[in-house]
């Protein structure tokens, strides 16, 4: 048997087993200005941007054998606009070339999701709110 055995538990009872020679786990961190829901209404929301990014990832890489998103977290309260959002993306590929393509798809999807949240809130790069950047930003490690 060549490669690694990757087991991804999806949902409560479903399981998917994939063969992969190359695997990688990316951490996506999304940051925004956050704020209290009353005084900062209309600010960009890092959790909303994260969900938009995940929807774009699922469109770009529909195979659960190649891509699994997990561990989403963010925000601090039900009545606060989330200043942060985080999730993991597990990728499985047959070789380094395919892995590079998958990583590019994740990068493009996250950018598209973040850009959509910024556009929805009509935020421009460099704009400030409460002395901090108004736009949602992201890093992928």
Predicted regions and their residues:
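Metal-dependent amide/peptide-bond hydrolase catalytic core
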Residues: 21-141
């Amino acid at each position: 048997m060549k490669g690694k055995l990757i087991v991804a538990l999806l949902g409560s009872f479903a399981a998917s087993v994939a063969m992969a020679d190359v695997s990688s786990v990316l951490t996506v961190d999304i940051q925004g200005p956050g704020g209290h829901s009353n005084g900062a209404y209309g600010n960009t929301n890092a959790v909303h941007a994260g969900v938009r990014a995940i929807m774009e990832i699922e469109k770009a890489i529909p195979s659960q054998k190649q891509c699994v998103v997990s561990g989403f977290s963010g925000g601090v309260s039900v009545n606060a606009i989330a200043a942060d959002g985080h999730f993991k993306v597990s990728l499985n590929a047959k070789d380094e070339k395919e892995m590079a393509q998958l990583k590019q798809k994740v990068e493009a999807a996250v950018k598209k999701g973040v850009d959509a949240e910024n556009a929805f809130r009509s935020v421009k790069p460099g704009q400030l709110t409460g002395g901090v950047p108004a736009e949602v930003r992201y890093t992928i490690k």
